[in-house]
């Protein structure tokens, strides 16, 4: 859900930003790898937190489940500090590797710095989402995912184009709308958590340095993070190649990857959703349920991927029209989607 939401944020940003011109769309595309790095770390470690919680709950050890949730929040704070420092130090030098166009560089730098320096909303929101998933509260995560997306969709045109008396902030407005959507979802998670009683409790009394649980979180989280980072590395390499030809190709690549990931994300969501179920049943020794969950999840994911492939092949022009594509963007984009 968190990954799907992030891709929806990116696509909505790109649809509105494309109205500002190809340079603005290129700027958001160049910012994507760094933005995805935040997501990769948050989701990867979040998966580790969720896995640890579900395993300990399945084994009937509530105390360790509480400790895993609390340590997960503490580790998220450390990651948040790291990304703020990164946003202030490496974002502009990184972006200079891919463009010397001053307008594109300025817009990309502003967008990236806002998203990285205010990344606490995304990081903590995803941590809470994974904690809720770890205890099986899938409906709540879905509702709050939708709430954050709605806030972003409403604010994007207002802040980008300056509606309802707000100043027109352009690309910066897209970034601000994104982080406000993330922070809104985080605040809703905190409110829901504090007003209800759940299977795990986050508290300072559970904040104990437990090497085994930390190792458990990172042993699952780091491989997941690395796997999710690979597309960012690929996109960065391709951006460096394509900028030698035309900034339009960078914009096309950005649109293509966001659409590709958006199509892929429902299948990924199925896989993410099966993890706490598998973890709980594995901890309870229910091997037959583990096998049936894996089988059903993989079949459903394959069906979703097939549907996405058919849409991309059949309706590429209609999809690209959402991004206000000019002739050059449309021509290259249709080829990329197909």
Regions found by a protein language model. Give the residues of each.
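Short, small-residue-biased leader/transition segments that mark boundaries at the very start
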Residues: 3-4
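Residue-level recognition of transmembrane alpha-helices
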Residues: 29-32, 76, 112-115, 119, ...
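Membrane-interface helix-loop junctions in multi-pass transport and translocation proteins
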Residues: 139, 150-187, 316, 322, ...
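Small-residue-rich hydrophobic transmembrane alpha-helices
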Residues: 25-85, 122-141, 239, 252-316
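Helix-terminus/linker motif at the lipid-water interface of multi-pass membrane proteins
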Residues: 8-26, 95-102, 158-169, 229-262, ...
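Short membrane-interface helical motifs at transmembrane helix boundaries
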Residues: 82-113, 307-334
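Interhelical loop/hinge segments that connect adjacent transmembrane helices in multipass membrane
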Residues: 175-178, 190-231
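Alpha-helical transmembrane segments of multi-pass membrane proteins
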Residues: 102-128, 259-261, 267, 327-338
């Amino acid at each position: 859900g968190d990954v799907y939401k992030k891709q929806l944020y990116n696509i909505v940003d790109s649809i509105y930003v494309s109205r500002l011109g190809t340079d603005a769309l290129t700027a958001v595309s160049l910012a994507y790898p760094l933005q995805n790095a935040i997501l990769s770390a948050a989701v990867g470690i979040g998966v580790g937190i969720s896995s640890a919680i579900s395993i300990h709950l399945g084994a009937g050890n509530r105390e360790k489940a509480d400790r895993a949730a609390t340590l997960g929040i503490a580790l998220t704070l450390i990651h948040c500090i790291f990304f703020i420092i990164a946003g202030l130090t490496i974002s502009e030098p990184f972006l200079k590797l891919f463009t010397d166009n001053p307008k594109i560089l300025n817009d990309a730098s502003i967008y990236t710095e806002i998203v990285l320096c205010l990344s606490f909303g995304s990081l903590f929101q995803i941590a809470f989402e994974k904690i809720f998933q770890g205890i099986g509260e899938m409906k709540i995560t879905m509702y709050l995912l939708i709430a954050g997306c709605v806030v972003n969709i409403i604010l994007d045109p207002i802040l980008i184009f300056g509606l309802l008396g707000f100043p027109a902030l352009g690309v910066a407005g897209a970034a601000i709308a994104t982080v406000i959507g993330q922070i809104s979802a985080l605040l809703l998670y905190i409110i829901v958590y504090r007003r209800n009683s759940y299977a795990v409790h986050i508290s300072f009394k559970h904040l104990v340095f437990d090497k085994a649980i930390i190792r458990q979180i990172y042993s699952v989280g780091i491989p997941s993070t690395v796997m999710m980072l690979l597309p960012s590395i690929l996109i960065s390499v391709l951006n460096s190649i394509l900028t030698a030809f035309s900034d339009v190709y960078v914009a096309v690549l950005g649109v293509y990857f966001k659409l590709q990931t958006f199509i892929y994300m429902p299948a990924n969501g199925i896989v993410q959703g099966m993890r706490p179920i598998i973890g709980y049943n594995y901890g309870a020794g229910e091997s037959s349920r583990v096998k049936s969950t894996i089988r059903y999840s993989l079949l459903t994911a394959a069906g979703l991927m097939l549907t996405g492939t058919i849409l991309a092949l059949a309706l590429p022009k209609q999809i690209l029209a959402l991004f206000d594509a000019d002739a050059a963007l449309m021509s290259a984009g249709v080829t990329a989607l197909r």
